[in-house]
């Protein structure tokens, strides 16, 4: 008897998930393998991917359009949380995993599967994200992980697939592993495993090289309501279209490339190349608007919790109780984050040149001005400073004799 009878496999069309299909059937005795491929705005035609799964031996091959929930339920909360893992990576890939896991569980319930499966290897973050998300949503459902257990190198995996007539998409000329969705692209493997090797221009697709960007700067305005971006240059856009527009604007000016050494969940460091033009642009603008509309103590506390929020998402704990509790805090802070931020895009940089909030700005010109309109009570400062510095004064009197 096999490890499971009917399995729903998260399918991307790549080497590992394609090889999983015959492997589950031939090696583990699975009778039916149903694949599910998610459309996350990656731009691929899903029909060839669907057919590829059937050619590899899938009993049924399903595809699903998840672009709208991906942006509204996952990307926008990340923008509100200014989510940057280790201060840099805006979680473009990590945000997709809990959504895919959620839909995987739903499909498994719909078709009566007794297990789900994925093609993640034992060294990556995605295995953690899928396993933990599925356990959070359906603790009774078995999770099969052939790529983690088969012990094959990438070359051996490709060779196994060739036994079943699968052509290899990886060549000596293009040895990279690429994951993409509407929010961005992650590129790794091949020569990039040497952290001293500069990424070649061929690995980028969403952003221009700085020397190929316009010589003239472009100023844009991004409008936010309740912490969510709603308009660019005065034109209101639904969420998916807004992300596409932000990608185009930022990418045209070479904004959004990251080359970083990253600490993976499993304890190793990895070299990652990311392209996330629109997401980074929107987070930068959102942070600037918060500096105008949030009280100082709220802003400081939020900046601390943003790091934890990003860590939780990166570590696969999207559906965990702490992440959900932090969501409540983040959402409450965004009520008054309404306004417009102006940025200048030029040669790989986005520079804030203005910010305004008609109803929620905490910047009061009359209090900040040094001119004749100054309404700040300077005389109050003396008493404030005395009380503020009293603990230090008392300590000094005791210890600096």
From Swiss-Prot:
Identify the residues that bind L-aspartate: 121, 125-126
The UniProt entry's GO biological process terms, in alphabetical order, are: argininosuccinate metabolic process; L-arginine biosynthetic process; urea cycle
Report whether Translocase shows up as a keyword of the record: no
Where does the record say this protein resides? Cytoplasm
Pathway recorded for this protein:
Amino-acid biosynthesis; L-arginine biosynthesis; L-arginine from L-ornithine and carbamoyl phosphate: step 2/3
Q: Which UniProt keywords apply?
A: Amino-acid biosynthesis, Arginine biosynthesis, ATP-binding, Cytoplasm, Ligase, Nucleotide-binding
What is the name of this protein? Argininosuccinate synthase
Its taxonomic path starts at: Bacteria, Bacillati, Cyanobacteriota, Cyanophyceae, Synechococcales
